[in-house]
Amino acid sequence: MQKKEENKIPKIIHYCWFGGKPIPKDLQDCIDTWSILKGYQVMRWDESNCSFDENEFVRKTYAEKQLGFIGDYYRLKAVYEYGGIYLDTDVKVCKSFDPLLDYPAFLNFIFDCSVGSAIIGARKGNPLIKALLDMYDNTTFGTNRSGKVFEWRDGK
């Protein structure tokens, strides 16, 4: 039987910052609010610890300097491989995530109850996060005559 702590979302905050530029003050002010999360480790994902050779989607978006799309992939990869909570840099934390750590995963909702990607929490190896991550293996990036930015390899 697993210990209770092993069956929780770990106290790790992940965030992505690609492009090498300094973080603007307004975003740093948001990141600074994360300090209320006592006992949490913060992991930054950037050019120093990402390979950009994960799949065709990552290679192409990196080559075309589409940094936001790169973050879409690496937020999922970080949460899948380490577990923890991904936060966009414009997220202000007002209270602890501790009450959510017993769940297998959680996502934020935005506007009209659409699922957002600014906050993603999950245990290491979570199958939902894996399924979302695997979608990028079947996604190409680029525009075509229809104006699509993304396209599934089966043409949908």
Residue ranges and their predicted role:
Residues M1-G71, L87-K156:
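Glycosyltransferase-associated regions of secretory-pathway enzymes
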Residues Y73-G84:
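Small-residue hinge/turn detector
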